Design a protein with these regions (language model features):
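Extended hydrophobic leader/signal-anchor segments used for secretion and membrane insertion
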Residues: 1-164
Length: 164
C-alpha cells in the first residue's frame, strides 16, 4: 500500500516507493492521519472492489468521512483492527451495511462511528476521478444491487480478464 499525506503527495514526483505493512497497524495510522485532517492516498489491495478498482493498479484518496450516505465507498473498521474499503449499501440508525463491488452476496456491518474515511478521489488506470464527480457517480449507480445480475456481470468480467 502507498500512504502519503496530502501535502507530501503534492511534493512527490510520479515515481514513489511503496512499502507493505500489516493492515491492522498500518490502517490504524492511516485513521490517525485522516482524523488529524490529512488526506491519505492508498494503493488498492484485493479484488473486492472489482470491476472498478483493481488490485495493486489503482489508488484511492481518503479524507475525513463527514456525512456518509448509501452509495459512498468508505474505509470502515468492521472488527477491532480489521478494516475494509467497501461501498455502503444501507444505513439504519447507527448500523452501516457494506459490500464490495466485487462481492456477490457477502456484506459487512459496522457502526457509523467506525467509518474511518470517505473517498475523495480515485486514481484508476492512472486517471483521476473525483468521488463526487459524474463519472464515478455514474459507475456507482450503474453497478447493480441485484445479486443475480451482479453475479453474471462479475463472471463475464473475470472471463474477459483471463483472455487479456
Amino acid at each position: 500500500m502507498l500512504c502519503r499525506s496530502d501535502k507530501a503527495m503534492r511534493q512527490v514526483p510520479h515515481k514513489t516507493a511503496s512499502i507493505e505493512l500489516p493492515n491492522d497497524k498500518f490502517l490504524k495510522e492511516v485513521r490517525t492521519l485522516i482524523a488529524a485532517g490529512h488526506d491519505v492516498t492508498l494503493r488498492v489491495r484485493g479484488v473486492s472492489m472489482r470491476p472498478f478498482l483493481e488490485d495493486r493498479r489503482d489508488q484511492i484518496v481518503l479524507t475525513q468521512p463527514g456525512v456518509v450516505k448509501v452509495g459512498d465507498a468508505v474505509l470502515a473498521e468492521i472488527a477491532p483492527g480489521k478494516y475494509v474499503y467497501h461501498r455502503i449499501i444501507s444505513i439504519e440508525g447507527d448500523k452501516v451495511t457494506l459490500r464490495g463491488d466485487g462481492n456477490v452476496y457477502g456484506t459487512e456491518q459496522c457502526r457509523l462511528e467506525d467509518v474511518a474515511a470517505a473517498t475523495k478521489e480515485l486514481i484508476r488506470k492512472g486517471r483521476s476521478y473525483s468521488a463526487q464527480g459524474k463519472a464515478w457517480r455514474y459507475y456507482s449507480a450503474l453497478w447493480p444491487s441485484w445479486s443475480f445480475a451482479r453475479r453474471v456481470l462479475l463472471k463475464l468480467y473475470r472471463m474477459l480478464k483471463l483472455y487479456k
